[in-house]
């Protein structure tokens, strides 16, 4: 696998942004055998440009550049195709002015013959465009730096790229690239253009406009699993032609085809309040639910430790069955199961200890009975189940009224994982200490 960084636009590329790209790819498990930066291959790009110029298939445009965009695209608006005055300068005069140091943009000399340039796109099908509708696009900017068109084609040829797979917004650029390949005497690769990922308002995703939500590392840091995020990305504009949604990396590789790609742009749904797409969260939760406990423990341990807690792998293995069905993101372990890791529970309202259809007096009776019961009960799931149900019967109350105050006392809230498993993992000493503190709050 080859990783090529298109960084010829030196003003817009920074080492920080490149590092973020590298980290994102590595997190997704996309490793590479060779790495190239286009900015380090300028000699190769210029060699192709000089070859095309020598064949008379390009010309120097000495018109003062109005802007970088104008130099890149060949026009600043309207239906500009070429500048006849520049296009028709003789080779001798062009060479003389270039040697004298006069700045120029090197442009491709698009033939004005009305020829139809055709290619088959693996996603969008047969495409064609007349050369009469293609402007004399730039190959080299006035500072000598190659444009995207030239650099991409030169590198594709040199690295023997078989398939160019890129965003749909480059579909029209392909006609220009075919002309470059033809002029260089190189066979064009196959092309496949993918639908774009767009924001809910229909705009193209942009870090400048939409912030960190467009960065892969944002999802990594939020607690997404790499395999789940790949699953989500693949389903944006592609489907396996059946009703499957949760798929492993191996399953995706096995069934993927260009034929399954939708031509419509794919929307990533996010808001300021909910920065992550609901489908992405659901898929992540599904992958978490089906992970082996040991594998999930490897993912959760760093999250817990980074929050300043110390926990053994054995203890984490006990916790996982209690929370695995309740977390959507890895970081949720700190909210769903925080009471497993803290030495002392955060403050909570003593009113939370009062069971339904009960009062503070009943809550106090329940907790005092629980303290007595748990001091001698067998501290296993089944042993705790039997002992606490017997205690409820002894008090003449429903089991739910017994369990509610205990759950709040040991977890600090009413919503928590299954009670008996939670008590077993916390252990006798911790449970008794927390119940004693709850009794003190009620008194």
What do the predicted segments below correspond to?
Residues 1-78, 172-186, 228:
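N-terminal Rossmann-like or analogous alpha/beta NTP/dinucleotide-binding catalytic cores
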Residues 3, 60, 64-193, 198-207, ...:
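Active-site cores that bind ATP or allylic diphosphates and position pyrophosphate for catalysis
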Residues 3-7, 159-164, 214, 370, ...:
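Glycine- and acidic
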Residues 10, 186-347, 354, 411-443:
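Catalytic adenosine-cofactor/nucleotide-binding cores of aminoacyl-tRNA synthetases and other
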Residues 21, 52, 56, 108, ...:
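Residue-level signal for inorganic ion chemistry
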Residues 23, 50, 182, 231-234, ...:
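Generic alpha-helical structural context detector
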Residues 297, 353-410:
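C-terminal accessory/binding modules appended to enzymatic or scaffolding proteins
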């Amino acid at each position: 696998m080859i990783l090529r960084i298109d960084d010829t636009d030196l003003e817009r590329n920074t080492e920080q942004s490149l590092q973020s790209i590298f980290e994102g790819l590595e997190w997704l498990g996309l490793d590479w055998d060779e790495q190239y930066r286009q900015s380090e291959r300028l000699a190769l790009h210029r060699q192709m440009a000089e070859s095309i110029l020598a064949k008379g298939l390009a010309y120097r445009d000495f018109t003062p550049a109005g802007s970088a965009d104008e130099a890149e695209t060949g026009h600043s608006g309207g239906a500009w195709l070429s500048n006849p005055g520049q296009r028709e300068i003789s080779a001798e005069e062009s060479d003389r002015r270039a040697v004298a140091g006069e700045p120029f943009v090197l442009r491709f000399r698009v033939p004005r013959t009305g020829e139809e340039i055709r290619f088959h796109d693996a996603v969008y099908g047969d495409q064609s465009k007349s050369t009469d509708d293609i402007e004399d696009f730039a190959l080299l900017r006035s500072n000598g730096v190659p444009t995207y068109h030239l650099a991409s084609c030169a590198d594709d040829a040199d690295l023997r790229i078989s398939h160019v797979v890129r965003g749909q917004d480059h579909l029209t650029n392909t006609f220009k690239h075919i002309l470059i390949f033809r002029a260089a005497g190189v066979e064009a690769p196959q092309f496949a253009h993918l639908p774009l990922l767009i924001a809910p308002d229909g705009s193209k995703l942009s870090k400048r406009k939409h912030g960190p939500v467009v960065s892969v590392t944002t999802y990594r840091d939020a607690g997404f699993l790499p395999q789940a995020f790949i699953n989500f990305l693949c389903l944006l504009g592609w489907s396996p032609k059946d009703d499957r949604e949760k798929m492993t990396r191996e399953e995706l590789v096995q069934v993927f085809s260009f034929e399954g790609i939708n031509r419509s742009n794919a929307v990533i749904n996010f808001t300021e309040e909910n920065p992550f797409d609901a489908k992405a969260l659901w898929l992540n939760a599904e992958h978490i639910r089906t992970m082996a406990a040991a594998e999930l423990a490897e993912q959760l341990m760093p999250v817990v430790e980074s929050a300043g807690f110390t926990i053994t792998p054995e203890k984490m293995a006990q916790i996982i069955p209690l929370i695995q069905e309740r977390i959507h993101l890895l970081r949720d372990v700190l909210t769903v199961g925080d009471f497993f890791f803290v030495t002392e529970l955060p403050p909570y309202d003593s009113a939370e200890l009062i069971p339904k259809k009960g009062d503070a007096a009943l809550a106090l009776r329940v907790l005092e009975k629980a303290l007595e019961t748990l001091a001698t009960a067998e501290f296993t799931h089944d042993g705790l189940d039997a002992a606490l149900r017997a205690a409820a019967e002894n008090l003449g109350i429903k089991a739910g009224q017994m369990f509610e105050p205990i759950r709040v006392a040991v977890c600090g809230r009413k919503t928590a994982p299954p009670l008996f498993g939670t008590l077993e993992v916390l252990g006798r000493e911790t449970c008794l200490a927390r119940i004693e503190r709850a009794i003190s709050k009620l008194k």
